[in-house]
From Swiss-Prot:
Name of the gene encoding the protein in the UniProt record: rlmF
Reaction catalysis annotation: adenosine(1618) in 23S rRNA + S-adenosyl-L-methionine = N(6)-methyladenosine(1618) in 23S rRNA + S-adenosyl-L-homocysteine + H(+)
A GO BP annotation: rRNA base methylation
Species, as recorded: Pseudomonas fluorescens (strain SBW25)
UniProt enzyme class: transferase
UniProt keyword S-adenosyl-L-methionine present: yes
Protein name as annotated: Ribosomal RNA large subunit methyltransferase F
Length: 339
């Protein structure tokens, strides 16, 4: 994706606006307490719901049941079993070579976003179809909308530039009879993220995004090689097969990498300052945070924060920002109140 510069819309700050909070990572967090995936997996229970998983179960070097996470087929079937067992998703599959994200980490992002909404709603998580979420670049897997709906009954709009990914996600949504609560939309301009996508009158309580994190295909390939070698070190007997962690080019890299993509997203978000309560995006590289902080200030963001997450040995985080004052946030939350 080529990320052109985006003109900042002319907008006056409200008199009650406060200076944007600097983006400073919080202390490391553990798996979210509402995450269903704490502790070890009961593989025999998973096999009962998804029998095809049995062929991929192995005994790891520690004598425990696991799967070969270096096998795309094993990871895909494992994800299918998790989504079926924990979330009631009866039908889930993706085309070969498309990104197959780890479900626990994706669930963490959803739960922490729920906490973000609760923070402006007297600690109560708003639930149901009144909450609208935009998943930017949902991919073929459609995992965020599936988890978000099953956990909180939120309604989703998923956007994607790849027509094959849109078709795959549509098949998942339709086969699980979720078309009324999960809508899909193709972004026809690959050089834009929010612009040319949203329609007049649309409002969202949240946006979420798993951005491309590499700046080139070469960088993405080297990243895959590092993952393979890390897995090889965990099992000295492992032979390094053909690189294939899954992921199409639009999922893995874009011109300028993660920093360029996120800063463009921030710039474009200013055009929808009062159409969205909280914008957010994952940030895989902590080294990109200073550039992101600069972009937030330039865009006129009034409040921002970094939420650190931890899944096993992996550390991740997301950045969230809003253009709305505290008073405007309180007005916004009134739409969540049901009669």
């Amino acid at each position: 994706m080529t990320a052109p510069s985006t003109p900042k819309p002319q907008r006056k700050k409200p008199k009650t606006a406060t200076t944007a909070k600097p983006v400073v990572p919080r202390k490391e967090a553990t798996l979210h307490p509402r995450n269903r995936h704490t502790g070890r997996y009961d593989f025999q229970a998973l096999i009962k719901t998804t029998p095809e998983l049995a062929q991929f179960v192995i005994i790891n070097p520690y004598g425990k049941e696991s799967i070969d996470f270096a096998s795309p087929d094993a990871v895909r079937v494992f994800n299918r079993a998790l989504l079926k067992s924990f979330y009631g998703i009866q039908h889930w599959d993706i085309p070969a070579d498309y990104l197959c994200p780890p479900v626990p980490g994706r669930a963490d992002y959803v739960h922490f976003l729920a906490d973000l909404l609760a923070s402006v709603n007297d600690g109560k998580i708003p639930r149901g179809s009144i909450v609208k979420v935009l998943d930017i670049g949902m991919g073929a897997n459609c995992v965020y909308p599936l988890i978000g709906y099953m956990e909180y009954r939120w309604n989703f709009l998923g956007s994607e530039v790849d027509p094959i990914a849109v078709a795959a996600a549509k098949a998942i949504v339709q086969s699980n009879d979720l078309s009324k609560v999960i809508q899909l939309r193709q972004q026809t301009n690959p050089k834009q993220i929010l612009l040319s996508l949203l329609e007049p009158g649309e409002r969202f309580d949240l946006t979420m995004c798993n951005p491309p994190f590499h700046a080139s295909m070469d960088e993405a390939t080297k990243g895959s090689e590092r993952k393979w070698r890390a897995l090889g070190k965990a099992d000295p007997k492992r032979k390094l097969p053909v690189l294939n962690f899954g992921g199409q080019s639009a999922e893995l890299w874009c011109e300028g990498g993660e920093a360029r993509f996120v800063t463009q997203l921030i710039a474009e978000s200013a055009h929808f300052a009062h159409k969205v309560l909280w914008f957010s995006t994952l940030v895989s590289k902590a080294s990109n945070l200073p550039a992101i902080e600069t972009a937030l200030k330039k865009a006129g963001v009034l409040e921002s924060q970094v939420v650190e997450m931890s899944q096993g040995q992996k550390q991740s985080r997301f950045v969230a920002w809003t253009f709305q004052t505290k008073n405007e946030q309180q007005i916004w939350r009134q739409r969540w109140v049901r009669d």
